[in-house]
Amino acid sequence: MAVGMLAGCGSKTNAPADNQVKEETPATEATAEPATEEAAGPEIPTELEHIKVAYMPNYASLATIVAAEGTGAFEKYGFDVELVEFADGPTIISAMESGSIDYAYIGTGAHKLCVQGRADVICFAQLSNADAVIGNTDMGVNTVEDLKGKKVAYSSGTSSEEILKATLGKANLTMDDIEAVEMDASAITTAMVSGKVDACATWSPNTLTIYNELGDKAVELGANKDFTDTNVSVSSFIAMPDKVKNDRDQVIRFVEAMYAGSDFRNTDFDQ
């Protein structure tokens, strides 16, 4: 808050011949600047707005959303939330473009579509370490080099593709050196466990299922932790560009709810 300050006092002039001293200029109080009001937050609607929020079936995607829901943050900011499950980020963005989803969580790979202008990142979710490339030793895959010429399942446009390319790079291999088998993220686990592919690139909880099912036959060839010096696996919450432009108050309220959920996660992790 601005505080009024006293102006400097006037000084005496040289005494005239009759030794009369001119009066000092009286001190004057400067006009106080008006207090600057804090910017008003978004207006909370009197009735809850129904919104659809897309997620993927893993901890990273759900943790903040569930925390926001469980602590009442969504209701506090005026939302009645319907959660809708998807297998991957690109599919989510396609659904958003059709108007069936309002907000969503995406992993690293789908950020390419944001760069292309198809969606806007509205807030940071977290850094991920859930992606991995897994080989099946029964299929002759023990090292990254063994992937050459092998069938490797991945999901295009997702963090699955990102971790696969990074892992191949460790052995100076590219996608052209393998038999890349593109498939829906939800189908990768079944293909890997059934032996239809020799290796795969996927994320949690698919990775956990594969390790449990294959046991000692599963070998990790690459993971996020191997590339922290060159790659960052970022997850974010997104909205459509038109919504960000035309419904800014609602977007801000959604972000506030997400950050409330994130704060709860950070301070009450055990819950």
For every predicted segment, state its role.
Residues 5-21:
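Bacterial lipoprotein signal-peptidase II cleavage site
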Residues 7, 131, 208:
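Glycine-centered loop/turn positions within well-structured domains
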Residues 15, 19-20, 137, 217, ...:
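Short linear motifs in intrinsically disordered/low-complexity regions
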Residues 23, 30-184, 191, 198-204, ...:
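Short, glycine-/small- and polar/acidic-enriched structural segments
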Residues 108-110, 181, 186-271:
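Pocket-lining segment of extracytoplasmic ligand-binding domains
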